[in-house]
Amino acid sequence: MLNLVNLFIFFPILLFLHCFFIFLFKKWLGPFGTFYSSLLVFLTSLILTLNELYFILLYGEYFFIDFGRWFFCLDLIDSHLVFCVDSLSLIASALVLTLTSLALYFGIEYMYREAFINRLLYLLNLFATSVIFLFFCYDFFLILISWECIGLFSFLLVNFYSMRIYTIKAALKTFVFSRISDLFMFFTFILSILVFNTTDLSLIFLQVPFFSFHYLFIGNVAVHFLTLFSFCLSTSGVIKAAQFFFHVWLPDAMEAPTPASALIHSSTLVVAGIFLVIRFSTLFEFTVLTNYYLALLGAATLSFSSVTAIFQNDIKKLVAYSTISQIGYLVCGCGFCCYEEVLIYLIIHALNKAFLFILVGYTVHFFNGNTDMRQMGGFYIYSFDIAVLFLGVCLNLAGLPYSAGFFGKEFLLYQLLRDDFLSLIVRSCWLVSFFFTPVYMFILIFVVIYGPKKGLINTYYDFWSFKWVHEYYLLILKGNMLSKNTNLKSVNHQNHLTTYAFQFTIATCRTTTYILVTFWCFFIFFGETFFSIIFNFSTLTDSINSDFFFLFKTHTVFFMNSSSQFLGDYLFSFILFFSTCSFIFLLNLKFTLNYKYLTHLWILDLIFMITTLGLLWSTSTWSYIPFILITTLYFLKFNR
């Protein structure tokens, strides 16, 4: 066990060494070598993370390792290389490693023809490494350095297309707000040195109860020290999370490449800000005013951003304001001291929003780089599987009942069931968000995906090794048409959309689609049960239960029994939705090879659809006989 822990502790250093390796040999590796080496290192680190997380959750342990002093300055700064491996850092690292691996795959596929793709992959590696170092550091000086690195690499990623004037403006705006966040973090670091006389978080947490009545005097004004300390710390985190008054940099930061947006603005960067608040949760138990500040700020953010998202015409800015609104839930939850629920919804949101950014990237590339939703539409005609995934992710983020997004919001909303003036204010803001969140999600669905076709498409061709698949099915299409005595030239013209639909569906999105289906199906249906194991995450000092704020936790969803009606409805909805999705994928396969428009269905297709849906609602075993018969005829006609 100790050897495994030592190996795991060194895996952030392994990530740093890997970044140094690909920087030295970037000309020899090329984009594919950089991609495969990065993917190998991140997947290996992910396996180590999950293995260690299993043992820590099983035995309820944590590991605190001090490698000794590494920086000393005038008896003020005595920094040690201190790392803490607990379930909180492991869960956050597993999330970042998973999404980074997905972003790397999407990045190499999406930007293969772009210039400086090596620089993009290198910056993605450095950014993810900095965030993971932040998760494991247990010394304030190391946290400050990691925080600065995160701001630097996010600025470089936003400024990737540095020849564009709008990109330069967005990068400068990102840099300014990042400096403001770093300024608050540096001021917190100075306070920890002057008052706590240490930068070790374990020693800081041990001293927190003794400073609950400690005041700093600025002239004749007395300021509560822990309130000032927690205010600066939380402000540094909420600026990174793009909350109200500090949100203006995030929509402009969409000038970054789509893989960087999927990694930074949807999951990793906001994870860092919320993680900082959860890590210092012991401190916030003694600072009531800071909790009120976080609750009101998060409530104002989620209501303001949900209303603003409706008036956006740019698809990336709509998703950006959606991210700001959803992070408002997390900040508001931190204000109510329900850190476990925040951690659950953080994972749900990060996974779904990263997948949504990837789907938006495919959509934008499909429409020749156009991001104006008024010129989009009819996307389901060309790639119906991506349209189905788009629908599922948007419904999950909108809070579809029985989905993971619904349960995550329910846990946070349960903390507001108290007759208090602040609770009523926050609840009113949540009601505004609950109304407008499905509205802008359905705008995204019915304008871009299922709306009328208005824009031009991009005949994108895959560069991977499965070109024979496309050529094989293209020959099948030509052979079927030639067998009907049709001119080959007219065949190519008539089946251009069909050929492109297959090309985009099978070649461009093959592995990414399967990954999205797997993760989406798991987290939308079974993720709620899995998240129950992470509630009691271990820390060096136990969180102190406080009666100052709203702390009322009774999660009835986690205690469902097999005979409950709720569980029966839950499983029935899963079977219905999963079977419907399977049917849509099957229909999409047939549409891809034979149809130009989805509305051109055969009679047998309609019978198959009616029989399948009737079977789902029927309890009789005799209904399986026509289902099997119709399915057999369907596949015989399909394979003929």
Residue map of PLM features:
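Juxtamembrane membrane-interface segments at transmembrane-helix boundaries in membrane proteins
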Residues: 1-4, 77-85, 212-226, 379-382, ...
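Hydrophobic transmembrane alpha-helices and their helix-loop junctions in integral membrane proteins
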Residues: 100-143, 152-505, 525-529
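N-terminal signal-anchor/start-transfer transmembrane helix
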Residues: 10-27, 238, 242
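Cytoplasmic/organellar membrane-interface segments at the starts of transmembrane helices
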Residues: 381-386, 447-633, 640
